Amino acid sequence: GESIVFSAGTSEVTPRRLKQTFEAEVADRTPRDSFYHCLKNSAHQFHNQQEGEHYILAGYPWFKCRARDMFISLPGLTLALDEVDQFEDVMKTAEKAIRSFINDEPAGYKIYEMEHPDVLLWAVWALQQYAKETSREQCRQKYGELLKDIMEFIRQRRHENLFLHDNGLLFANGTDKAITWMNSTVNGHPVIPRTGYIVEFNALWYNALRFIADLVREGGDVYLADELDAQ
């Protein structure tokens, strides 16, 4: 039989293009014919584009793009689906936000809570997953300078609440403000204030040291690699 195309809207469209537009949307749609495709469709719902920038929403209905949640979830929402280009799109926006933060410039991007102490360490972890999915060489070429800048920012003690002590561990103060994933608050105060050598921060720190040291050594920067190995 013949197809009938019906369109209703608040503005005029060219009728002869309706079928072509519909078919293009159907082709772009993720089918719901398997458990994998249902997961893939759900993953795509967390992607958010605004003004040419790419973000990952922390959740629905009210969460925005939160830095820690973005870096933790980014590999699973992109690389696990063989969508390397989507990872790079989000990281392109994230890199600009990171550089604004470490250079103490006004935040011009809609990524919130960038100041939390472990965010940069999670960014390194996300890039480590990118290196596993693509190659260490590709990661070094595309993100090597960013990784080195993050490492120097931490090692030079420029973060306002992430302090590298002489024992090689990172210290953070969460007495008055929730700074970890355990971020519930009552009357503006953290329910579980965490201060000190927070275990996951230092696990991420050790991981970042080893990953970046190996990466830069493979790229010929033996001096920096030796410094990180001795950290």
Name each model feature, range by range.
Residues 1-231:
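Acidic, mature catalytic/reactive cores of soluble proteins
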